[in-house]
Amino acid sequence: MSKRKITDPYNEKFEPFNNYGTPIPGMSWHKITYNQKTGEGTYILKMDPGAKSRYHEHTNFEEFIILDGELIDYDNNVFKKGDIVTYEPGSKHSSYTKKGCLILTFMRGINKPSEIK
């Protein structure tokens, strides 16, 4: 017998996004397989209009797919519905959204808060 879980990203219960300890206003998540201790796994991230992520560094690869809305990176690149984005280890950035967005995120390591330089 298989162990299977089906996730509907539009109808799941979301909790405040607290991956850095303190919840970030306007950001919430639904963990699918994500392990906060190892930073590995998958989660759905919801950002309300006007939400902004903390500036952080990727210790390993992170990939995500924009399921809905759009996300604007610190360098003003705009990621739209259907875009698949990859951040390599050592990448540093923050992102924000004007309209709100829903993102399916695949993590391979813990992101750590960083200073803007």
Regions found by a protein language model. Give the residues of each.
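Conserved short histidine dyad/triad with adjacent acidic residue
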Residues: S28-H58, E88-K92
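Glycine- and acidic-residue-biased ligand/ion/polar-headgroup-sensing regions
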Residues: P49, H58-Y74
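Short glycine/proline-enriched turns and hinge-like loops at secondary-structure junctions
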Residues: E57-T59, N77-V78, T97-K99
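Short acidic-glycine-tyrosine-enriched beta hairpin
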Residues: D73-H93
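Ligand-binding loop in jelly-roll beta-barrel domains
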Residues: P89-S114
